[in-house]
Regions:
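Membrane-interfacial amphipathic/re-entrant helices at transmembrane-helix boundaries
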Residues: 1-26, 53, 64-76, 102-106, ...
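Inter-helical junctions in multi-pass inner-membrane proteins, predominant
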Residues: 3-21, 128, 153, 174-179, ...
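Single transmembrane alpha-helix segments in multi-pass membrane proteins
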Residues: 8-57, 90, 94-106, 248-254
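Helix-loop-helix "hairpin" substructures at the membrane interface of multi-pass membrane proteins
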Residues: 18, 149-230, 254-259
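Short loop segments and helix-boundary regions at transmembrane helix junctions
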Residues: 34-42, 86-132, 174-181, 236-239, ...
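Membrane-embedded helix boundary and interhelical linker motif in transport proteins
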Residues: 35-38, 42-90, 150
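Alpha-helical transmembrane segments within multi-pass membrane transporters and channels
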Residues: 64-114, 121, 259-264, 268, ...
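Transmembrane helix-bundle core of multi-pass membrane transporters
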Residues: 98-99, 107-177, 204-207, 270, ...
Length: 308
């Protein structure tokens, strides 16, 4: 295989890895918007909290002498999901439920306030400096090689792909076949009608925040291990990129969030490789603008009809 093709293949691997985590975070944005028509701008901070919780659990277990990689990561996942889900429920209960019937600008201000509070809370309690995470998966496989370049897949990339696939599959099955999943779909179609039919809409809305937070926590654990460093400010840009992925795929559409995340991740990887890392954010947001010019509702979004 030619060196140019191997280099392109390597960037595709990197893009799918990054896009998978964007898709996980984007799920939270798209589910909340799909039901209550609001954007949870504190969602990125939940991702950040998930990465910190997993770090603390892994560090504590390693101090106790446990050094099995999969066991440490599994414990990190469980702890991060539980704590992040509690934060997701709290954000809905404190930041959204009291202002749900108010103007959207008020809810937006409330969400931004929650984001700033969580960011500064972690900064004050854990410090504002970068924290290095222990590397638990160091293996890699050579997919193809030439004289000067080899395309590889790392163990951590495989873990990210497998965990993302399992999480997406579990969410799809839950939404499609479970009783609460059907309630979520009913609320997404018509919240008022769902309430009239006896569905506890408050519980469903809280559940969407919890599910979104759990997905963000999974992404936090994965990206923390992939990059090896975290800080209290990683949630802002990750949240913005995931929001971009959700809008790109069609805000309110779960498959759209998955597709948007993958497209965005691949676009970032290719732009970093063939242009410069300085342009990756420019390319990401320019791609969003171009897609919305052609498809204003995103790739899989549906146009909304508002009654006046």
């Amino acid at each position: 295989m030619s060196e140019q093709f191997l280099y392109f293949l390597q960037q595709m691997f990197n893009g799918v890895t990054l896009g998978s985590t964007y898709a996980l975070i984007a799920i939270g944005y798209t589910m909340v918007y799909g039901i209550i028509g609001m954007i949870n701008f504190a969602h990125g901070e939940v991702y950040m909290i998930g990465s910190y919780v997993s770090f603390m659990i892994i560090a504590a277990l390693m101090m106790l002498g446990i050094d099995t990689g999969w066991l440490l990561v599994a414990a990190g996942f469980i702890g991060a999901i539980i704590i992040a889900s509690a934060y997701g429920w709290s954000i809905e209960r404190v930041g959204y439920r009291p202002v749900r019937s108010s103007k959207r600008l008020i809810a937006l201000i409330s969400a931004i306030g929650m984001s700033i509070f969580l960011q500064n809370f972690v900064s004050l309690t854990e410090g504002s400096r970068d924290v290095a995470l222990p590397s638990l998966f160091n293996g890699q496989w050579i997919v193809g090689h030439s004289d000067n370049f080899s395309a590889t897949i790392t163990t951590m990339q495989l873990v990210i792909w497998v965990v993302t696939f399992i999480a997406m599959l579990a969410l799809t099955l839950f939404i499609r076949y479970s009783r609460m999943g059907r309630a979520c779909r009913a609320c997404a179609e018509d919240l008022k009608m769902a309430s009239l039919l006896g569905i506890n809409t408050d519980r469903v809305i809280a559940l969407t925040f919890v599910i979104g937070a759990a997905m963000a926590a999974v992404a936090g654990v994965l990206l923390g291990q992939f990059y090896g460093v975290i800080n209290p400010y990683i949630g802002f840009m990750a949240g913005m990129k995931a929001f971009t992925a959700a809008v790109l795929g069609g805000i309110g559409s779960i498959p759209g969030a998955m597709i948007g995340g993958l497209i965005l991740g691949i676009a970032e990887a290719l732009s970093s490789a063939y242009l410069s890392t300085e342009y990756k954010d420019v390319v990401s947001f320019a791609l969003l603008i171009l897609v919305l010019l052609v498809m204003p509702t995103g790739i899989l979004g549906r146009p909304e009809v508002e009654k006046v």
